[in-house]
């Protein structure tokens, strides 16, 4: 994944964009064979929910049994770092420009929205995966479910 050099964002902004991208991406099974976002978002949501309690349990378990503190902390940090890796990947993916094949598909979906009478904002810069997620989410809400079959 390559990003534009002008897209220098801080690591915290990348995590925030990843969370926004995860919430925006439509969780439709028909997109799963083409895009890994469904799997990454599912794993990240799972990690956000279950890894912090697992880290606390692991830490208290090893301390209670008289284990060493170093490995206990390392295990807890590893468990808490897993969801951050998912958010990081999603954030980087969100700011990545679309490749030419997806760019064409992006414009086809936008045209379908425009043909259906929906107001579509003009594209001001190179569309990214976040732009694609926004368009797909809107298309799934406002178009019939067969719009993917025509593309």
Curated annotation (Swiss-Prot):
Keyword field: Cell inner membrane, Cell membrane, Membrane, Transmembrane, Transmembrane helix
Membrane topology: Multi-pass membrane protein
Subcellular location as annotated: Cell inner membrane
Primary location: membrane
Transmembrane regions: 46-66, 69-89
Record-level GO cellular component terms: plasma membrane
Similarity field: Belongs to the UPF0208 family.
Record protein name field: UPF0208 membrane protein YE1335
């Amino acid at each position: 994944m390559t990003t534009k050099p002008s897209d220098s964002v801080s690591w915290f902004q990348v995590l925030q964009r990843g969370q926004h991208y995860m919430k925006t991406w439509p969780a439709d099974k028909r997109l799963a064979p083409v895009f890994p976002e469904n799997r990454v978002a599912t794993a990240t949501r799972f990690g956000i929910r279950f890894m912090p309690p697992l880290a606390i349990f692991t830490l208290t378990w090893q301390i209670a049994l008289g284990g060493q503190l170093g490995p206990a902390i390392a295990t807890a940090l590893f468990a808490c770092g897993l969801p951050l890796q998912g958010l990081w990947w999603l954030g980087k993916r969100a700011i990545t420009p679309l490749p030419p094949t997806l760019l064409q598909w992006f414009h086809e979906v936008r045209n379908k929205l425009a043909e259906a009478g929906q107001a579509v904002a003009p594209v001001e810069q190179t569309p990214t995966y976040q732009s694609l997620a926004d368009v797909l989410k809107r298309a799934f809400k406002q178009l019939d479910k067969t719009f993917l079959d025509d593309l």
